[in-house]
Amino acid sequence: NFILVGPQNGLYKPANMYGQGTPIVRIDGFKSGDIIDNKEFKRLSLEESDIEKYKLNKFDLVINRVNSPEYIGKTALIRNLEESTVFESNMMRFAVDTSKLDTYYLLFFLKQQFVLNQIANKRKDAVNQSSINQQDVKSLIINVPPIELQITFSNFFQKLEKNRNLFNQQALNFDNLFKALQNQAFNGTL
């Protein structure tokens, strides 16, 4: 077992606690395979003890534990958070032994059909929602190549992610420029 911390269920607070205070990662705040850096998260008022208990750390992974069946197992990697940030109750967080299992490799692997099939077989279905528990996460079979190969893959994955983000930004800039030119052309100001 490569898990050092957790899996730990997240924090539940009623809606009237939201609005200001500590940032909280919610299940609607990421897509499967996301790397979570600083974002605009919702905030809620918490006691310091809750912040300490549910605080996300660099290289933690969060996994969706309660949702509609197609979203069970949605996973993200915590990378750089500038302030203490917690996570909500319908997800779990865990940390792995990074001397044996690279977190970027694991993030990629957890999105593969092999793992998603395991999660589908373990989930408990109820009316309009499904769930997995800590033991289900601990029992996932993970293919673990030597750490050197994982790191090589991780470096490639991170470069690919950086290039993808750059491409997406350039595509957005192109779209904005095209819309501006189109607007000028139709207004006769070109």
Model segments located where?
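Active-site/binding-pocket entry motifs
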Residues: 30-33, 69, 116
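Non-catalytic DNA-recognition/assembly elements of restriction-modification systems
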Residues: 1-9, 139, 143-151, 158-184, ...
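Generic structural signal for secondary-structure transition and capping sites
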Residues: 8-9, 115, 124, 190
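A short beta-sheet element
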Residues: 26-27, 51-111, 131-133
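A short glycine-rich beta-alpha junction/loop motif
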Residues: 83-92, 101-104, 119, 123-151
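Sequence-specific dsDNA recognition surfaces
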Residues: 1-16, 28-61, 81
